[in-house]
């Protein structure tokens, strides 16, 4: 039953849909693969869903990335990308299905090397924000390759001074950066991006986010503690049912649900033997025996 509960939980995860926007070479694939498990950005080029946007997804994976072309395009193409993003948002909302909706937009700006503040990018973003006023899809500005941190912080301050209607500006270094073997700048910012995503997404997508993200163990633990607290509250009430010898059998379904939720949040692929071992340590040998027979 526990394995069935886990499989059912995984099957029922809502699909998280993210639009990722930015110039070519901004590091979108590195960002995606560093934040999410299974290296979704390496599953292929994706399939075109409009003339400018491609959808990257994987079978039995509860997330899709909508990738836009770089901004080294003509002014007309840039305008077309913007219109197609808004059209994609409206089409998803029109279905009334959360699995089809766009839940977040990442606007990626490369601040590495000798990159400087580009007002053209900010102006494009302002136009997108204006068109997004009705749909209000959360927008996060991700400053990629933000090394050194002082450079990322400076760019963050410049973008924040624009007073854009966005969720947050986050400097990120998605992978460790090696400087000729003499110094290694450690990756940072991915855990903060997960936290901001968690704040921006609805409750229906919280389990999905934790399932697919691999950058923040702290966030997974926080979500799992909430699951345990909820299960404990239910078990406390069930434990007082005045039926002789019923407690263990009554509690087990609650604990199965709890274990399934935690396993899903951690994105683990585990066997029945591992599950039974975990159950034995949490609800005891007697509970494992009852569960094994059911």
Task: Annotate each predicted stretch with a short phrase.
Residues 180-181, 199-219, 244-247:
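C-terminal helical "lid" subdomain and adjoining coupling/linker elements of P-loop NTPases
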Residues 81-167:
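Conserved C-terminal guanine-recognition region of P-loop GTPase G domains, centered on the G4
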Residues 39, 73-74, 113-116, 150-151, ...:
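Conserved protein kinase catalytic core
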């Amino acid at each position: 039953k526990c394995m069935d509960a886990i499989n059912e939980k995984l099957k029922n995860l809502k699909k998280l849909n993210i639009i990722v926007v930015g110039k070519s070479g901004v590091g979108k694939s590195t960002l995606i693969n560093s934040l999410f498990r299974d290296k979704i950005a390496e599953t292929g080029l994706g399939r075109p869903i409009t003339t400018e946007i491609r959808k990257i997804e994987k079978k039995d994976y509860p997330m899709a990335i909508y990738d836009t072309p770089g901004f080294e395009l003509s002014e007309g193409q840039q305008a077309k990308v913007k219109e197609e993003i808004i059209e994609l948002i409206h089409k998803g909302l029109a279905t009334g299905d959360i699995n089809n909706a766009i839940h977040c937009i990442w606007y990626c700006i490369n601040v590495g090397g000798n990159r400087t503040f580009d007002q053209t990018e900010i102006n494009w973003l302002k136009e997108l924000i204006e068109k997004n006023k009705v749909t209000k899809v959360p927008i996060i500005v991700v400053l990629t390759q933000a090394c050194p941190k002082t450079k990322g912080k400076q760019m963050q301050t410049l973008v924040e001074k624009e007073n854009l209607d966005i969720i947050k500006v986050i400097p990120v270094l998605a992978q460790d950066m090696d400087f000729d073997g003499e110094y290694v700048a450690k990756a940072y910012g991915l855990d903060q991006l997960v936290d901001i995503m968690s704040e921006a997404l609805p409750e229906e997508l919280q389990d999905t986010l934790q399932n697919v993200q691999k950058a923040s163990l702290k966030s997974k633990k926080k979500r799992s503690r909430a699951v345990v607290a909820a299960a404990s509250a239910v078990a406390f009430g069930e434990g007082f049912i005045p039926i002789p010898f019923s407690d263990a059998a009554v509690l087990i379904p609650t604990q199965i649900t709890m274990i399934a939720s935690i396993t899903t949040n951690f994105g683990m692929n585990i066997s029945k033997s591992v599950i039974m071992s975990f159950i034995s340590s949490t609800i005891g040998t007697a509970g494992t025996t009852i569960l094994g027979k059911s």
